[in-house]
From Swiss-Prot:
Mg(2+) binds at residue 194. Component of the cytochrome c oxidase (complex IV, CIV), a multisubunit enzyme composed of a catalytic core of 3 subunits and several supernumerary subunits. The complex exists as a monomer or a dimer and forms supercomplexes (SCs) in the inner mitochondrial membrane with ubiquinol-cytochrome c oxidoreductase (cytochrome b-c1 complex, complex III, CIII). GO terms for molecular function: copper ion binding; cytochrome-c oxidase activity. It comes from Trypanosoma cruzi. Binds a dinuclear copper A center per subunit. Its EC number is 7.1.1.9. Residues 37-63 are mitochondrial matrix. It is found in: Mitochondrion inner membrane. It catalyses: 4 Fe(II)-[cytochrome c] + O2 + 8 H(+)(in) = 4 Fe(III)-[cytochrome c] + 2 H2O + 4 H(+)(out). Component of the cytochrome c oxidase, the last enzyme in the mitochondrial electron transport chain which drives oxidative phosphorylation. The respiratory chain contains 3 multisubunit complexes succinate dehydrogenase (complex II, CII), ubiquinol-cytochrome c oxidoreductase (cytochrome b-c1 complex, complex III, CIII) and cytochrome c oxidase (complex IV, CIV), that cooperate to transfer electrons derived from NADH and succinate to molecular oxygen, creating an electrochemical gradient over the inner membrane that drives transmembrane transport and the ATP synthase. This is Cytochrome c oxidase subunit 2. Residues 1-15, 85-210 are mitochondrial intermembrane. Its cofactor is Cu cation. Gene3D superfamilies: 1.10.287.90, Cupredoxins - blue copper proteins (2.60.40.420).
Length: 210
């Protein structure tokens, strides 16, 4: 489901950042250790000498084990993300999304047709976001599982809702499917993420969950 996918995506990114920070810290620590063994002079039996650091089984073992643990953690999170992305949940209702140049058409509950176009700047109200406001908003219920069928008529579009972790291509003659779910009331904004013509940047998506 969408909110699960977005949660695991954020969790994966956070894990990568933490692991990369730890790897950078260990690399800096090893470099400082090697540099100190070469530059610092030690007095042994009244003879000044430097440490000759050639190899260390401890460092090799430590680096190998930690690296394997990092890879396993990332693989586990990637497998969970792939698993939730392939799950087929029982949906409450079906919503069809069709992309045109350059607007969206939603077919909801098998009978309602919504044409969603970008509104003119002269019609903006206070607080409206530029290039993200539509004349008709798709209104859905929160805590309800919807199945989206997305397609296109003329060229390839991309139905993208970044905050829900959704990005699916709308291809003419092909119907792609994705599960849509929101855990709370919210207004979700998105745009077409595929170069579909001169007005590609003027195809906003607005979904209001109530």
């Amino acid at each position: 489901m969408s909110f699960i996918l977005s949660f695991w995506m954020i969790f994966l990114i956070d894990s990568v950042i933490v692991l990369l920070s730890f790897v950078c810290f260990v690399c800096v620590w090893i470099c400082v250790l090697l540099l100190s063994t070469v530059l610092f002079v030690t007095k042994i039996n009244n003879i000044y000498c430097t440490w000759d650091f050639v190899s260390s089984k401890f460092v090799d073992t430590y680096w190998f084990v930690i690296g394997v643990m990092f890879i396993m953690c990332l693989l586990l999170r990637l497998c969970l993300l792939l698993y939730f992305g392939c799950l087929n949940f029982v949906s409450f209702d079906l919503c069809k999304v069709v992309g045109f140049q350059w607007y969206w058409v939603y077919f909801l509950f098998g009978e309602t047709t919504i044409f969603s176009n970008l509104i003119l700047e002269s019609d903006y109200l206070v607080g409206d976001m530029r290039l993200l406001q539509c004349n008709h908003v798709l209104t859905l219920l929160s805590l309800v599982i919807y199945k989206l069928w997305v397609s296109a008529v003329d060229v390839i579009h991309s139905f993208t809702l970044a905050s829900l972790g959704i990005k699916v291509d709308c291809i003419p003659g092909r119907c792609n499917e994705i599960i849509l779910f929101a855990s709370n009331n919210a207004t979700i904004y998105g745009q077409c993420s595929e170069l579909c013509g001169v007005l590609h940047g003027f195809m906003p998506i607005v979904i209001c969950f109530i």
